[in-house]
């Protein structure tokens, strides 16, 4: 009976040994340079299966061009009520085709106002009548750089020398763990 328990524990220990080595590999820094570092970061950041998400509503092309779709339809730059017509048909419809090939008469802009819903969500339009448009644009830039500074301080800590040394240099010279390489994915995460 004792031998059976001991042999079971021995086999259990032998089976768990490879799994304990995997945890050591994740916490151990690895020196990666150049394309090897890039491949590891891409593997780490792109582990989730993006094909199961419906990306059409979030695509920037569908915000600007409602006729564009990723579901196999081709993009049609010539819809009937579009500003594209101004550049693709420079001659008014009443002019003959022969005369149209020898003259270039640009049409006027169509009378249509852009709605705020068609603009990018973070885009802001400032006029000079509002007082200080430069100050407002600087404030918007500060918000985006504050996020980057937060990411940087998570990775580098408060050491100025470490901040000066780049991410690739640190991983190449000293080495990076998987947790440190995961910080490279943070700028691509939408908060």
UniProtKB/Swiss-Prot annotation:
GO terms for biological process: apoptotic process; ectopic germ cell programmed cell death; fertilization; flagellated sperm motility; male gonad development; negative regulation of apoptotic process; negative regulation of developmental process; negative regulation of reproductive process. It holds the Pfam family Insulin. CDD domains: IlGF_like, IlGF_relaxin_like. The gene is Insl6. Belongs to the insulin family. The keyword Signal applies. GO terms for cellular component: extracellular region. Disulfide bonds join 33-172, 45-185, 171-176. It is found in: Secreted. The keyword Disulfide bond applies. The lineage of its organism: Eukaryota, Metazoa, Chordata, Craniata, Vertebrata. May have a role in sperm development and fertilization. Keywords: Cleavage on pair of basic residues, Disulfide bond, Hormone, Secreted, Signal. SUPFAM superfamilies: Insulin-like. This is Insulin-like peptide INSL6. InterPro entries: Insulin-like, Insulin-like_pep_6, Insulin-like_sf, Insulin_CS, Repro_Hormone_Insulin-like. GO terms for molecular function: hormone activity. It comes from the Eukaryota. Residues 53-161 form a propeptide. Its main location: secreted. Residues 1-22 form the signal peptide.
């Amino acid at each position: 009976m004792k031998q059976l328990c001991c042999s079971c524990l021995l086999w259990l220990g032998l089976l768990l040994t490879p799994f304990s080595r995997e945890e050591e590999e994740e916490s151990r820094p690895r020196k990666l340079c150049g394309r090897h570092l890039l491949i590891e970061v891409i593997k780490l950041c792109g582990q989730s299966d993006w094909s199961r998400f419906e990306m059409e509503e979030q695509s920037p092309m569908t915000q600007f061009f409602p006729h564009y779709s990723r579901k196999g339809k081709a993009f049609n730059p010539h819809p009937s009520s579009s500003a594209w017509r101004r550049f693709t048909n420079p001659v008014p419809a009443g002019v003959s085709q022969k005369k149209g090939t020898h003259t270039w008469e640009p049409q006027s802009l169509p009378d249509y106002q852009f709605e705020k819903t068609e603009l990018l969500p973070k885009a802001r339009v400032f006029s000079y009548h509002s007082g200080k448009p430069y100050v407002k644009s600087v404030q918007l830039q500060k918000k985006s750089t504050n996020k980057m500074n937060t990411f940087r301080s998570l990775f580098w800590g408060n050491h100025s020398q470490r901040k000066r040394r780049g991410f690739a240099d640190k991983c190449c010279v000293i080495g990076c763990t998987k947790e440190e390489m995961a910080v490279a994915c943070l700028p691509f995460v939408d908060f």
